[in-house]
A protein has these predicted regions:
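A glycine-rich beta-to-alpha transition motif near the start of alpha/beta enzyme domains, typified by
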Residues: 1-112, 165-279
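Short, flexible, solvent-exposed loop/turn segments with mixed acidic/basic and small polar residues
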Residues: 5-7, 153-156
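Flexible, glycine/proline-enriched loop segments at strand-loop-helix junctions
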Residues: 73, 121, 128-133, 167
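Membrane helix-loop-helix hairpins that form the core translocation module of multi-pass transporters
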Residues: 113-123
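Beta-strand scaffold of nucleotide-dependent catalytic cores
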Residues: 118, 155, 209
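Active-site glycine-rich loop that binds ribose-phosphate moieties when present
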Residues: 124-153
């Protein structure tokens, strides 16, 4: 079977995008995501994002995200910008687009060529929102977490999907392939967790690496960047109401915490290529 696709990336967080607006999501999507995401052997990506017909009145489309291991995710900040860019270049040429996701409806505004700003909605540091267990009810903004014999100070933030944020002295020296899986599968997070390791440069500049559940280390994570800035704002490190620049391996995202604990994220959305895969 031949499968048309578009490969896109936001800060090098790359996905394979499928137009499922009429056909629906393929029945074998989990296996497809595992197969097509393999780097060096297939297209290679962090997963597949299906662009579907909207389910909410007034929305322009819906996205469903499937990680490289075939599991379905709730939300991807980099991915939703790319969905907006794809819709914009495929006949929905509106400066502001509305996209349904598994964590609610998101509004995305075009800020320039291949540049979009997403209204991510609110965040929560309460245990039930992640979920997290054996850590108290929350807010979980400065908690001890023992991982393979070492105790880390973490903040646990939900932005529609669960994140565990920890501050380190030197993010580049970390061996994420060793410690990332232990965080992801920690028993305190029954649905697994995404983990952000952040180095504070100053109050409005951060360096970050991320271990995503279901995908491993990725070069960027929009929701993870939002969770990181939210956590450091709660801790008094970053200022609310100001742009915070976060440098990831794949580029820069700009996050702002608004009144009411709402989040804005601004970043790129770039088409890499289009093609047809034999599946």
């Amino acid at each position: 079977m031949k499968l048309s696709f578009t490969k896109m990336q936001g800060c090098a967080n790359d996905y394979i995008y499928l137009d499922c607006r009429e056909s629906g999501v393929p029945e074998n999507i989990a296996a497809l995501s595992q197969d097509l995401s393999r780097r060096h052997f297939s297209i290679g990506a962090d997963g597949i994002i299906c662009i579907c017909a909207p389910v909410t009145a007034g929305a322009d489309g819906r996205m469903r995200i499937f990680n490289a291991d075939g599991s379905e995710a709730q939300m991807c900040g980099n991915g939703v910008r790319c969905v907006a860019e794809w819709l914009y270049t495929h006949g929905v040429a509106k400066e502001t687009l509305v996209v349904d996701t598994n964590s609610g409806t998101k509004t995305i505004t075009r800020k320039g060529r291949q540049l979009w700003q997403v209204e991510m909605g609110g965040y929560s540091a309460m245990a039930a929102a992640l979920p997290a267990v054996n850590m108290g009810e929350g807010p979980l903004v400065d908690c001890p977490l023992t991982v393979e014999g070492r105790t880390w100070r973490v903040a646990c933030i939900s932005v529609g999907n669960p994140h565990c944020v920890t501050v380190v002295d030197d993010v580049d020296s970390l061996k994420l392939e060793d410690i990332g899986p232990a965080f992801e599968k920690h028993p305190n997070f029954p649905e697994r967790v995404n983990t952000e390791f952040v180095q504070v440069v100053d109050s409005t500049h951060l360096k970050m690496r991320v271990w995503e559940r279901g995908s491993g280390e990725t070069w960027a994570c929009g929701t993870g960047t939002c969770a990181t800035v939210a956590a450091l704002t709660e801790l008094g490190v970053c200022p609310a109401g100001e742009d915070v620049h976060v440098q990831l391996r794949g580029g820069e995202l700009i996050i702002r915490v608004l009144p009411g604990k709402k989040l804005l994220v601004t970043g790129s959305a770039v088409t890499v290529c289009e093609g047809i895969a034999e599946v």
